[in-house]
Amino acid sequence: MKIPKRIAQTLMNSLKGGVVPRVGLPYVTVGRKAEIDALLHDVDIIADGGASFRFIVGQYGSGKSFLLQTIRNYVMAKNFVVVDADLSPERRLQGTRGQGLATYKELVRNMSTKTKPEGGALSLILDRWISGVQQAAVEASGLSVTDPALSPLVEKRISAVIASLSEMVHGFDFARLLTLYYRAHLSGDDETKAKVLKWFRGEYATKTEARQELGVNIVITDDDWYEYLKLFACFLKQANYAGMLILIDELVNIYKIPNAITRQYNYEKILTMYNDTMQGKAQHLGIILCGTPQCMEDPRRGVYSYEALRSRLAEGRFSGTHKDLLSPVIRLQPLTPEEMLILVEKLADIHAGLYEYEQIVAQQDMVDFIEIEFGRIGADSHITPREVIRDFIEVLDIVYQNRDVKVRELLSGGDFAYAQNAVQEESADGLFAEFEL
């Protein structure tokens, strides 16, 4: 398996550090076929003008973020725009100190397309939209780009897009700013273009500032930022993209909010998103939220503590142990030992290619490693890919640098320390979940 060294190094560094790489995921993807297929079905619905909403639930290290990145890369290749953010104490869905707006800013900052997958694609999208409208007008009229008669035709097409947005909540102001951007683009006014981009990114703190610089008497706030994402989704379809996917990870940070009322406001925002997508109010929009079982199911602090969400999301009496990937909640099951073995085989190949050595970890060594990992107490239900990956990369690093060390000796020795179990991590967090100042 030949992998560019830049990608191989990124994979090794990210995976050993316990984080999901942005590049090279296909080289290490194993399992999760049913979950990926279910999410890709949602993608088809979004492209047809529908909307979707999913929770991905799994323990720390079970592959939630990995699955998000896999879907992210796939939909960008299918001409979707993706915005993603990790929640934190400073980034929530709703807050009294701008935490909701901070999440919006992070989402827009990370706006990505196939040609700009690292984020910051907003200006590229707007410029591409204008160029696309101009090209369509040229093809329809037969006029040249420099012909003065082309400008009214382009204006007419721009107006048609803007009119379709004006009917939505905050659509009039959104459309007005698109018009400002288009006219600034025509006149080469980079300063105005920068101001419009600043507004779209949610960086105007007051209405007064926005009115003085752009002539609009509105700014994006904690209360209405989600409405602007719905506007973006509809605009992006008009700009010849397939739709927009919103990816929000670390939902546990809402679970950890000490104030019950603040938590309820955040769950209310989730309910709004859920209802919009399920009832058909949102179009060309997909939303995926990721969290742990505890942050979903805890009856006092979790998502299910909000009765309106619990009644919509809780499993029915027929589900039992069977998987239902058509429900809004996708629960990640542990990878099988066979899938884990395939994963470590891929890691061994990548490691050998990166450091240019002949494979020194035998197939039987890998089998022994997996047997030992799954032989730990509670591993059948609690072991996660993150633990296995970090342990195995550590084994590879040690035997590569110490050629006299045998894998079997290393695994049976007392010096080798396994990665911390995901359940232990979650339990440690839970010790302080109720602590308030």
Which residues does each PLM region occupy?
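A short, basic N-terminal segment
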Residues: M1-S52, L150-S151, V405-L437
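The catalytic "switch" region of P-loop NTPases
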Residues: K2-I7, K193-V361
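Conserved phosphate/pyrophosphate-binding and hydrolysis machinery centered on Walker-type P-loop NTPases
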Residues: L25, T29-K33, G61, R97, ...
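Amphipathic alpha-helical segments in well-structured domains
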Residues: I36, L68, G100-Y104, R263-I270
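P-loop NTPase nucleotide-binding core
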Residues: F55, S62, F66-A239, Y400-N402
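Gly/Ser/Thr-rich loops at beta-strand to alpha-helix junctions
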Residues: Y60-S65, V252-N253, T384
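C-terminal alpha-helical "lid" subdomain
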Residues: T179-K198, S319-K323, Q333-L437
